[in-house]
Amino acid sequence: MTNRIASFAAALACLAMLPAGAALAADHTVTISGFAFQPAAITIAAGDTITFVNEDGAPHTATADDGSFDTGRLDKGDSASVTVASAGAIDYKCNFHSSMKGTVTVQ
């Protein structure tokens, strides 16, 4: 019983050391299908990760207009993850198909 109380007290002490308001980064998925990003617009928090998954038969990229991320070539079944740290709106596109566009809004 004493070990349980000591373990509980140690766990509480560790929790107390965490910064107030600290949040865990979230993971988001954008699917590439039908020559479109789905969803085409996504809102995330700074530090979150976006995984782009290509479900099309054609190769695609997800390339930020401002150069902040680029998945490189994704063939069918491939995926790539990017983490965005700075707040703001980031437009991105597929380098192979100019009509494929999306926006990431980072808060």
Where do the model's predicted regions map?
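Extracytoplasmic copper-binding redox domains, predominantly the cupredoxin/blue-copper superfamily
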Residues: 2-8, 12-107
